[in-house]
C-alpha cells in the first residue's frame, strides 16, 4: 500500500547500501546519505539526516539513538517535533566495548531528554524508560499478520530450491552476529543429523565469513542468503518443524514476532 496522500513522507537511506537508487517507494520520497547507516558512521549519518530533514519537515521520526548525542546542539536552533523510537538497549550489548557502551548510554539519555515523544516496542522497554528516566513513552508493539500471504503453487518450488521437505527442518533467521548465538546453533546442528535452514547475512562480517567456512559444508545445514520475498519466507516459516531464536540482546525482534504468528514450536535463548 502507498503512504497516506494526506501526509508527505521523506525517508533518508544509506547511499552505501543500494547499487540502484529509487527516488520514490510507495509514495514516499527517498533521499540518500553518502554514509553507512550502521557502525561508527551511523552517528554522522543520523546527524546529517536530521539536519537535512529539518528544512522541510514538521515532524521528524528518529529510529535508534546512536546519533542523538547531537540533539542538545540541534535543539539550540530547531524546535521541530521529534519522535524517537529508541529500539533496544544498545548500551547493554556484549559486542560493544566499555567506552562504546558509555557513549550509547549517554546518547540514549539525550534522545529521551530532547524528544517530544518516545516510542517503545515492548512493555519491558517501556518500563525501563519510566524507571530510568521518569518519562512516559508510547507503546507500539510489533504485529505479525503482514507475513501471511497466498503462496499458490510456489510451495513445492521453494522447498525444492533449498533442498528441503515439509516439517523435516528447523529454521533460524537473524543478523549474523555473535550475540545472536549463531555459532552455538550451528555447532549443535553440525553434531546431529537434524536439518537446519539458517537465513542471514553471512558475507557482511569476518564472523559471518568464518561461520560460512566452518559450517557451510555440513550436509544437514543450509546457510541461506538474506530473503526478502514474503512468499518465500512464508513457505519456509510455515513448513518448518521448529523455529530457533538465539538473540541474547536488543529490543523486540520482528522476525521472532513474525515467526510466532505461524504457531510453530520456538526454541528461544534464555527465555
Locations of the language-model features?
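N-terminal strand-loop element at the rim of the active site
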Residues: 2-38, 124-132, 201-204
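An aromatic- and histidine-rich active-site surface loop
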Residues: 41-54, 59-87, 251
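Membrane-proximal helix-turn-helix segments that form the acceptor-binding/catalytic region
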Residues: 51-55, 76, 100-118
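Donor nucleotide-sugar binding/catalytic pocket of nucleotide-sugar-dependent glycosyltransferases
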Residues: 81-84, 108-153, 164-167, 172, ...
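Conserved donor-binding/catalytic core segment of Leloir-type glycosyltransferases
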Residues: 159-180, 186-199
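Nucleotide-activated donor-binding/catalytic signature segment of Leloir-type glycosyltransferases, i.e.
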Residues: 200, 209-230
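Aromatic "clamp/platform" in nucleotide-sugar-dependent glycosyltransferases that forms part
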Residues: 248
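Short hydrophobic beta-strand element within catalytic cores of glycosyltransferases
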Residues: 265-268
